[in-house]
Amino acid sequence: MAQEVDTAQGAEMRRGAGAARGRASWCWALALLWLAVVPGWSRVSGIPSRRHWPVPYKRFDFRPKPDPYCQAKYTFCPTGSPIPVMEGDDDIEVFRLQAPVWEFKYGDLLGHLKIMHDAIGFRSTLTGKNYTMEWYELFQLGNCTFPHLRPEMDAPFWCNQGAACFFEGIDDVHWKENGTLVQVATISGNMFNQMAKWVKQDNETGIYYETWNVKASPEKGAETWFDSYDCSKFVLRTFNKLAEFGAEFKNIETNYTRIFLYSGEPTYLGNETSVFGPTGNKTLGLAIKRFYYPFKPHLPTKEFLLSLLQIFDAVIVHKQFYLFYNFEYWFLPMKFPFIKITYEEIPLPIRNKTLSGL
């Protein structure tokens, strides 16, 4: 689809048929957990703040072709295939799949921190065939979270796309060994076919990955500034859509990983043209690039450790963060506890009884 589900091209290392995990080098992972910011610019004055929160995730009319500069370390969706059309009277078992991020490389290491990747499994009772469906980054997690600073370009260069991947088979051992493989519902073939049409539309219009959830504080009911758009959100959207079609889910606990930044009210800075264009704010543009500099990939160990110190100093001491969301830049005045990884329960949806005959 979007060349991903429909044509089966793809990117990621798997165990067996396995599923995709957050894919970046260990250095990117550490940097992600430490956050990023380099001092050098404070909040812009005179630019009006947007008052409608959270900022809606922007959808697009079509998925653009990736720039050749963007290269994946692990091929996206290498065993992918088109979503099949099911017989209307087929009973399709639906499974919740969850395993530690980077499990293919680090085993259960990140599972102990509850940093998990989510996917969905299906089994046709008529054919006995199993399928896996997931949504993840085309060019690994680091590229979706931080840009490249190319010397020939004034603006940071982003290799950020996420997409759905569908392939035959479920790697039972992978999901069961360190994670979860549990049936959550049974749907009809008609519901599955309806879902397949929705997945294609969702995949063609929701094109970029967003790592961060940004809130005012960890307190319940605190203002949410920005929502993430990642593998777990795809699973949640799909489950909700199946419930709209009439699927009835089991009453079991389902938890998901979320990475939070905490800040005061964000300040809107502008898009690439208004910040980095011919009439842009050169001081602001330089500050943003300095902010992202510690996240350069493939740093030598000594330089990488120095970058971590810069990150710690910036986010803890200077309380600054620049967020790129909807292809626009925002300034976040960071607040304690700055960053937090949670493993929160989000209940399975309730069936729409008016559509249960599908």
UniProtKB/Swiss-Prot annotation:
Residues passing through the membrane, by range: 24-40
Known catalytic reactions: S-hexadecanoyl-L-cysteinyl-[protein] + H2O = L-cysteinyl-[protein] + hexadecanoate + H(+)
Effect of residue 259 to S: Significant decrease in palmitoyl protein thioesterase activity
Source domain of life: Eukaryota
Transmembrane helix listed as a keyword: yes
Lumenal face of the membrane: 41-358
Site (Cleavage): 43-44
pH dependence as annotated: Optimum pH is 6.5 for bis(monoacylglycero)phosphate synthase activity. Optimum pH of 6.5 and 8.5 is seen for palmitoyl thioesterase activity.
Reported impact of residue 178 to Q: Loss of glycosylation. Effectively transported to the lysosome
GO cellular component terms given for this protein: cytosol; endoplasmic reticulum; extracellular exosome; Golgi apparatus; lysosomal membrane; lysosome; membrane; perinuclear region of cytoplasm
Protein name in UniProt: Bis(monoacylglycero)phosphate synthase CLN5
Result after altering residue 115 to S: Significant decrease in palmitoyl protein thioesterase activity
Disulfide linkage: 70-159, 77-165
Disease linked to the protein: Ceroid lipofuscinosis, neuronal, 5: A form of neuronal ceroid lipofuscinosis. Neuronal ceroid lipofuscinoses are progressive neurodegenerative, lysosomal storage diseases characterized by intracellular accumulation of autofluorescent liposomal material, and clinically by seizures, dementia, visual loss, and/or cerebral atrophy. The lipopigment patterns observed most often in neuronal ceroid lipofuscinosis type 5 comprise mixed combinations of granular, curvilinear, and fingerprint profiles.
Subunit note: Multimer. Interacts with SORT1, RAB5A and RAB7A. Interacts with PPT1, TPP1, CLN3, CLN6, CLN8, ATP5F1A and ATP5F1B.
Enzyme Commission number(s) from the entry: 2.3.1.-, 3.1.2.22
Keyword Cytoplasm among UniProt keywords: no
Keyword entries, A-Z: Disease variant, Disulfide bond, Epilepsy, Glycoprotein, Hydrolase, Lysosome, Membrane, Neurodegeneration, Neuronal ceroid lipofuscinosis, Signal-anchor, Transferase, Transmembrane, Transmembrane helix
Pfam families: CLN5
UniProt function note: Exhibits palmitoyl protein thioesterase (S-depalmitoylation) activity in vitro and most likely plays a role in protein S-depalmitoylation.
Residues the record marks as carrying a glycan: 130, 143, 178, 203, 255, 271, 281, 352
